[in-house]
């Protein structure tokens, strides 16, 4: 009976440590996610800038052609 209590106590202790480590890791992940929002904004800007540039490259000659009437 004593060895059973000892092993259960050991399992409880190890489980508590494991749970504590998981909480610390989860907290670190949440902090990292909060920092990622700035990186996501930069990535979104990088994705949209080429799109805007290509649309502008297509529209500017057409507008210039209509204004000057030299097509």
UniProtKB/Swiss-Prot annotation:
Signal peptide start-end: 1-22
SS bond list: 65-71
GO biological process: defense response to fungus; defense response to Gram-negative bacterium; defense response to Gram-positive bacterium; killing of cells of another organism
Tissue distribution of the protein: Expressed by the skin glands.
Localization per record: Secreted
Domain of life: Eukaryota
GO cellular component labels: extracellular region
Propeptide part(s) removed at maturation, as residue ranges: 23-45
Keywords for this protein: Amphibian defense peptide, Antibiotic, Antimicrobial, Cleavage on pair of basic residues, Cytolysis, Disulfide bond, Fungicide, Hemolysis, Secreted, Signal
Similarity remark: Belongs to the frog skin active peptide (FSAP) family. Brevinin subfamily.
Stated name of the protein: Brevinin-1V
Species in which this protein is naturally found: Odorrana hainanensis (Odor frog)
